[in-house]
Each structure stands twice: as C-alpha cells, then as structure tokens.
Amino acid sequence: MEQVNELKEKGNKALSVGNIDDALQCYSEAIKLDPHNHVLYSNRSAAYAKKGDYQKAYEDGCKTVDLKPDWGKGYSRKAAALEFLNRFEEAKRTYEEGLKHEANNPQLKEGLQNMEARLAERKFMNPFNMPNLYQKLESDPRTRTLLSDPTYRELIEQLRNKPSDLGTKLQDPRIMTTLSVLLGVDLGSMDEEEEIATPPPPPPPKKETKPEPMEEDLPENKKQALKEKELGNDAYKKKDFDTALKHYDKAKELDPTNMTYITNQAAVYFEKGDYNKCRELCEKAIEVGRENREDYRQIAKAYARIGNSYFKEEKYKDAIHFYNKSLAEHRTPDVLKKCQQAEKILKEQERLAYINPDLALEEKNKGNECFQKGDYPQAMKHYTEAIKRNPKDAKLYSNRAACYTKLLEFQLALKDCEECIQLEPTFIKGYTRKAAALEAMKDYTKAMDVYQKALDLDSSCKEAADGYQRCMMAQYNRHDSPEDVKRRAMADPEVQQIMSDPAMRLILEQMQKDPQALSEHLKNPVIAQKIQKLMDVGLIAIR
C-alpha cells in the first residue's frame, strides 16, 4: 500500500501543476495495485475532466460511487462529468442521490441548485419549442389571426430553431403578443406596472444575508483577517494598490489557511500589469486551497485569473489551458465565454500562420499529377492541403471541384465553384465547372443559366457554348416520371429546406384548395422566390 500512496501523491502533484497525462499514468498504475480504492478513481475522474475526456471522467465517477456509495465526493465527480456531457437531468439526479448520503455537503447542494437553474432556464429560454405550439396559438384569438400571415409563421419557426434570436425580435409587437399567449401572462400590462412598482418581497432577505453575523462563531484571528480584507478591498476599489497589498498581506498572516487573501493579492498584481507575480500568487493560492479543502469555486477563480493573465499577454494557448482547468473545477458562463474567445483567436492565428503560397503551389502540382493519373481521391487531398496553405487562390477551389465532380460529389463541387466565383468572378472555369456539376445532376435550367454567364464573360468559350446546347437538347428530350422529378428535386438541400418549412407546406396546401390564394402569396418576395424554386425543379406547376 505504500507504493499506492506514493503513486497517488505523485499523481496529485502532477495534477496540481497541470501535468495531466503524468497524473493519469500515476493514478492508473495505483489502481492496478489497489483496484478497490475509491479515492484513486475519484482523482483520476478529476484528471480526465481536466483533460476534457468527460466520458472517461464519468466512468471513473460511476466506479467511485459503486465502491463507496456513501461518499459525497464520488457523486460530485459523476455529476460534474454528466454536466460537461450536457446530460443535465442525470446530473441533477446524481446530486440528489449524493445528498441522500451527505445531506449537508455544500458541493452537492450547490451542484443541485446549478442544475435546477440550468434546467429551468433551458425550458424557459425556448417557449416556442413546446409540442402543441400551433394548437395553442390557434386557440387564442390574439394569435389566431396572425397565423394567416406566412411571415409570422416564418418568424415563429426561426425562434423555434434558434431561441437566441429572441432578444432581437422583442420590438415586434407580434412576438410580445405570442409570448403573452405561450407564457400565460399579460406582458403588456407588466411593462406598465414595472415603472411604478416597488421591488418584490423576496430580494430584501437576500440583502440581509451577509457574512458578518457569522463572525460571532469565528476565532479572533479570522475576524481580524476579514476586517483587514475589507480594508484591502476598499483600497483596491480606490486603486490604492500598495495599501491594498499591505492589508491583504496582514489578513494572510492572521489566517494563512484562507486562499482568498492570496488571490486578492494576485488581483492587485493583475491590475498593476505584473502578470508573472499574479500567476505565482494564484498557484500559491491553489496550493493552500488544496491543502485546506477549499471550495472548488475558489480554486476555479484562481485558475481563471491565471488564464486571464495569459490572455492579456496574448498567450492564448496557455490561457485556454488554464481556463479549461478552471472549468473542470467549477463551470461558469464568463470563463466559458472567455475560453471560447481565446480558442477562436488561436484558431485564426494558427490558420494564418499555416498559409504558405509556395507550399500551396507544391500541393497543387501534386494534385494535378494525381488528377492526370485518375487518382481523384488523392488529388482531392492535395488540393485540400493547397487550399489550407493559400485559401485565397480561386483556381484551387476550381481544381478540387473537378475532383468532386469525378467522384460524383456534386453538392461539394457546387460549393467549391461558388467559392471560386466569389474569389475571382471573371474566372471562366469556375462557371463551366459549376454548370457541369448542375448538368450531371440533370438540373438543366440552372446549368444553362451558368453556362450563359460564362458566355457573357467570353462569348468564344467553346466549353460553355457546347454545354448550353447539350442542356437545351436534354431539357427538350427529357420525359421524367413524377417519381424521378421528385427524387431529383428532393436531393437539392434548398428544396429540402423549403419543403420542411411548416409555413411553406401550409401555403402549398392553400394553393391546392384555393388557386386564387397564390396571387396573395406571390406579393411576398420571399415566398415568391421559394415557389419559383419549386417550379424550376418541377415539383409544382402553375396553370
């Protein structure tokens, strides 16, 4: 067992300094020696979570609970992994199960509160996603009349699929009316009352819940430390950093087991721009926090501050590393947003650093050789690498589109042709290859349009002229069955989107029952464009 303890301590030390792989190796070796040690599985679960391997973190959390069902930490590990996996309902149940064994465990209590809040928020955030949405709107006279307007239905579907757009749509009185119906409250009257209403009863008790009364139970040194901290906070707010440091240092001397005073000092050095000192103090604070079993939220704050210091220095890779460590301890929206911001910047930096026109030319030539030999998959790989090296070269997209066409991946070919044309609108090959892909898909009307654009650029282009003639003859001679027309049309993503739109389906039903309704719908340019698309592919015909 001595060897197991040594490996565990070695793993703990590696984890505390961020050497996650070393920590995992130590814990795994210790588990081989002592496979029934619940603490080892708990520690390895934490390591996997910090690495971002949440499935394995979950598995180790489950094993911890199996081995020690009355230990609250095991449930915390399991629930945290479930939270990272976005399995919030299961995480909530896990926290509840843990509290049955340790009713006063603050970590489990806080975790349960977070889960309940997130689940409630998730349900409220998208009231447009209820299964009986249209029945509810149809049953209320305030929204029944709105349903006859296709633009209203489009708006509802947009919010149904993307609730984050709600904030930008609240100026639309139709949306406020809809929310009133869906939520069962009169939002209009609420707006008027809020201007004169006094604060609701619940907030005052929250204001009264201050830490000061608890000081009666604290030892004298901790009371004095808290007073010094408050003096330091006052000085910090006034940007009197030297005075703030003195008070925080005094608080630390009075209560050396409280990591908060050290992280407060780190905050001062962060504001002063001394990021190395800030990080040094945060690492020290984490060490003190671990030794004294500090709340994970405090550990997370220290890691986040280290991440912020690297972000300020534009060392985004290091910033991401410590943001992830913070999120593994305690997940907060602010840190998650900052981490995503750093990841976005780093990804763009790496993309720009990867650009090299000379290497792009080498890859292009290799792709051309493979294309000539008929090895289209390999040619596509070389062209893809060339595009990464020089994403502004239109000819590379054109070449890859030719590969996709040979491989019968016509939608991908069209996408590359669009990119090619956007980068170089006068490049004939972009148009002829796009038209060739459309011709292969038997979309002759569109293909002729694109061949015509190529001829507008160069009237002597034989490839475009021949293609136009072929499509014209094919269109004249085609005798497709209705099934063939439908199958070909439904292969078009744009048609799929139109036909899956409930508003458009309603309009098409109305057109079948009442042909006169068409003239009203065609007044809406968006609807008219969609109907024209369905006519072009042969799905509908207007007599």
Curated annotation (Swiss-Prot):
PROSITE patterns registered for this protein in UniProt: TPR, TPR_REGION
Phosphotyrosine PTM positions: 354
Short motif Bipartite nuclear localization signal, span: 222-239
Keywords: Acetylation, Cytoplasm, Isopeptide bond, Nucleus, Phosphoprotein, Repeat, TPR repeat, Ubl conjugation
Molecular function terms from GO: Hsp90 protein binding; RNA binding
TPR-type repeats, residues: 4-37, 38-71, 72-105, 225-258, 259-292, 300-333, 360-393, 394-427, 428-461
Modified positions (N-acetylmethionine) in chain numbering: 1
UniProt crosslink position (Glycyl lysine isopeptide (Lys-Gly) (interchain with G-Cter in SUMO1)): 123, 210
PTM-bearing positions, type Phosphoserine: 16, 481
Domains: entry comment: The TPR 1 repeat interacts with the C-terminal of HSC70. The TPR 4, 5 and 6 repeats (also called TPR2A domain) and TPR 7, 8 and 9 repeats (also called TPR2B domain) interact with HSP90.
Stated name of the protein: Stress-induced-phosphoprotein 1
This protein's encoding gene: STIP1
